[in-house]
A protein has these predicted regions:
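Aromatic (phenylalanine/tyrosine) cluster motif
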Residues: 10, 14-15, 19, 32, ...
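Polybasic, lysine-rich low-complexity intrinsically disordered segments
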Residues: 5, 21-24
Length: 239
């Protein structure tokens, strides 16, 4: 469970006038590190952009897929294994977004095992107890892998029900005060509830319908983008 920090609102209002639907996450200050992403390894970068998508808007899925494809191109995905790490537990409604996304994509990933690998499903979730071991396994087996991290997050009231996408790592568990390894080169989160006190209780009282809507959006967007990516990779191999 990642967190979208409500204290970034005054920053967001200013930068949205410039960047539209892009939220700027300033880095280097602990206040902002809790906002669903971690400090990048390259300390010369001063901010991360996280784009917000409202599943209820007609072009959101197209825009999400396009933005994700652009990030994959930027990360030179053609020559790398793509790893999906769907984080969360099936024991709390608000934290099961990742495993549900993994469950929905499992069959597709199984048919593209040569370059696409999935960790985290309802049957085999990736959570606080096995995340570190899973990451060690990934880094030992897949050299120069491109990791896409998917997790639920908490946020301000106007962002509940939104999807975020950006370049950088997630800090899983920050929303519920857990210290876990950073994950991902690209992050995707679904904002399932409000951030604040009593986060553990919020996970138990989150509406499953909202989680399913977010999971449907993320899994369909990933499916369309990765299908397109696999097709383009096949063309490059044919050349």
């Amino acid at each position: 469970m990642s967190i979208q920090n409500p204290r970034t609102n005054f920053i967001e209002v200013f930068f949205r006038m410039i960047f539209g639907n892009m939220q700027i996450l300033l880095l280097g200050c602990p206040v902002f590190k809790a906002n669903g992403c971690s400090l990048p390894n390259n300390t010369e970068r001063f901010f991360i952009m996280a784009e917000y998508f409202n599943p209820g808007e007609s072009r959101s899925l197209f825009n999400f897929t396009t933005s994700l494809q652009n990030l994959l191109e930027k990360k030179n995905y053609h020559s790398r294994d793509i790893i999906l790490v769907c984080i969360g537990s099936d024991r709390a409604t608000g934290d099961c977004l990742g495993p549900i996304v993994g469950h929905k994509l499992a069959r597709f990933c199984n048919t593209h095992k040569n370059s696409l690998h999935l960790f985290g499903t309802l049957e085999q979730p990736i959570h606080a107890k096995n995340l570190e071991a899973t990451l060690q396994f990934i880094h030992s087996c897949y050299k120069n892998a491109l990791i896409i991290a998917i997790d639920a997050s908490l946020g301000v009231v106007e962002h509940v029900g939104y999807i975020t996408l950006g370049e950088g790592s997630l800090c899983p568990g920050v929303g519920v005060d857990k210290n876990l390894p950073e994950v991902g080169d690209i992050f995707i989160t679904g904002i399932v509830n409000l951030s604040g006190f009593g986060s553990q209780m919020l996970l138990q009282t989150t509406h499953l319908n909202l989680v399913m809507q977010l999971a449907d959006f993320i899994s369909l967007g990933l499916f369309r983008c990765l299908m397109h990516s696999q097709f383009r990779s096949s063309l490059k191999c044919a050349e």
